[in-house]
Every structure is written in structure tokens, then in C-alpha cells.
Amino acid sequence: MSEMRLIVAGAGGRMGRALTRAISETEGVVLTGALESPNSELLGKDAGTLAGLPANGVLLSADLWSLSANADGIVDFTVPQATIANVAIAAQRGIAHIIGTTGLSTSDNAVIQSVTDRAVVVKSGNMSLGVNLLAAIAKRVAQSLDDSFDIEIVEMHHRAKVDAPSGTALLLGEAVAAGRKIDLATHSARGRDGFTGARKPGDIGFASLRGGTVTGDHTVIFAGASERIELTHKAEDRMIFAHGALTAARWAKGKKPGLYSMADVLGLGDI
């Protein structure tokens, strides 16, 4: 099989640089384009140099249409506004779109869904193997325990993270909600403060912590009478997300149009 030619969106950011490094370490993929916002001071810089590698001749550009002319896919860990702009071009070009952007709204997700009749999209709040295994396990635990066990999800990230709860926390919330056969949107408790009253039965609670340089810690708590189950994942290096995204990109090549998740990529649907 020929190499998969990939564009990295947000190539000047932390995840973008991690993706550039991951591509350089991974067989079967090659960096063919580096996308940045039109007002970035990094436009024209070499993507390899920015990632701490030897220069690779791939210069940062704001023109996705031109970059995508000779690409097979785009890996996108940016911000919602940028991702939604990229969705239309990726679909028009017929290239796979791997989306790790978090903080997407209901309307953003509707835009993404609207192109999946003609485009391959893999979207996940977390691309790591460990977190997706955690989600599958948490779903199974939620199926096995009755609602006398309260569910709380606690996450912590670095001080610069701008959205809360994290995309990973929401991914875990969706997993346990599916296990309970309830709708997360109507059973989500966030931002408790002051005199809130007793906990509503059946709610899934979220707590978000921010500080330091924490890459990402997530714990799903099942709290029952006199006993508690805690399932935890701690990310120590964002390269796990980069390598997971490349696994998704290679998996997506040649797939039929549709919206896929990392559970599809990793074959976790039956766990």
C-alpha cells in the first residue's frame, strides 16, 4: 500500500508539532502539508524545524485548498471554528478528516455530520488506546451496576486548556450514559456551586480541574453504598494522541463515507 499523504492542521501548535514528530517516526504516512491560521506569525516556517526535527521542506500555509490537492487526509487538533472551516474543504476534496478538536458545539457536530454521506470522518474526544479502552470498560461497568451507584467523572488538565469538561470527559460520559441507556444531555450535572441541594438520582456528574502542565488525567467513579469503584487513565505525553490519530488516519484510507470513532478504529465495539 502506498504511503498516506497527510496534512497537519494547527501545525505550529503543541499538538501540531507532536503530529509532525509522530509522522516522522511512523511508517506508511508522510507529511505533505502544514496548515496554520491566516494571521499566524509562523506562516512560511518549516514544519520540521518547528517540531524540533531537521527541516523537511513543508512550509506552514493558510491555504487548505491548495495543500489538499495532493493529500489523502488531514489530521485536525485545532479549535472549533477552524475545524468547521476545514470540514467543507476536506469533504470537497474527498480526503479523510481525522478530528481531535474538542469544545465542538451541537451545531458544529451537525455540520460535521452533514458531510459524512460523501466524506470519511473519524472524530474522537481522545485518540489514545488507553482512554478508548477505559471508555469501553466504563460502559460495561455502567451496564452491570444499577442506579444505586452514582457516577462522577473527574478530569484535570494544564492551565492553558480553554474548554471544560474536556472532550475526553464527555467521551467517557457518553460511554457510561450508553451503558445506562440514558441521554447524557438530560442527565449531566456540571459546575456545582453553593447550595445545590441533594444529588439527583441518575445524574452523571462532571468536575474539571486546571493547573500546571498536566497532559490529561481522567477518573470515572462509581460510588455505591459503602463501596466505590474508580477507573483512571493518566496521559503522560501528548504523543499518545498523535500516534492514535495516525492509526485512525491509516485505518480511514479507503473506507466508505461515514462518521467513525476511535472505537471503530480499534475494534472496541463489542467490549
From Swiss-Prot:
Organism per entry: Rhodopseudomonas palustris (strain TIE-1)
SUPFAM superfamilies given in the database record: Glyceraldehyde-3-phosphate dehydrogenase-like, C-terminal domain, NAD(P)-binding Rossmann-fold domains
Domain of life: Bacteria
EC number: 1.17.1.8
Residues at which (S)-2,3,4,5-tetrahydrodipicolinate binds: H158, G167, T168
Family: Belongs to the DapB family.
GO terms (BP aspect): diaminopimelate biosynthetic process; lysine biosynthetic process via diaminopimelate
Residues that coordinate or bind NAD(+): G10, A11, G12, G13, R14, M15, E36, G100, T101, T102, S124, G125, N126, M127
CDD domains: DHDPR_N (cd02274)
Function comment: Catalyzes the conversion of 4-hydroxy-tetrahydrodipicolinate (HTPA) to tetrahydrodipicolinate.
An example Gene Ontology molecular-function term: NADP binding
Catalysed reactions, as listed in the record: (S)-2,3,4,5-tetrahydrodipicolinate + NAD(+) + H2O = (2S,4S)-4-hydroxy-2,3,4,5-tetrahydrodipicolinate + NADH + H(+); (S)-2,3,4,5-tetrahydrodipicolinate + NADP(+) + H2O = (2S,4S)-4-hydroxy-2,3,4,5-tetrahydrodipicolinate + NADPH + H(+)
Record's protein name: 4-hydroxy-tetrahydrodipicolinate reductase
Pathway: Amino-acid biosynthesis; L-lysine biosynthesis via DAP pathway; (S)-tetrahydrodipicolinate from L-aspartate: step 4/4
Main subcellular location: cytoplasm
